[in-house]
């Protein structure tokens, strides 16, 4: 059983049909395979192929997806992936003309980050206190996942009374 990585994704594309295609694929739970399918020749080697080409072993477990009503060339989605964010897939989406902005947080292995069109701003949170995390990561990343708030709560619940 994997640790789950929380992901927040914003996609934009000049062709609104590509945004609709992404929306529909996310809604079906087939986003990765829609844009970067596992080749038939790799079906027996799916695990290696998926981790190499998507950055994770399974499709996204989507919890929300919507197209911006005011700007139909923009889509926002939230989903979980096994172990890590699908950064390799994001790189592929860029080659298809998408602008990709993503945030991710994996609480089990204590890392988080923000990815924007090829730049990964990665933060190793292992061994840091909630206060250190709050002062280390960008506010928008912390707010997206409630990282420091959850850590403060955990610290409070696990601090022995003196």
Where are these regions (language model features)?
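Long, contiguous binding/interaction regions
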Residues: 1-162
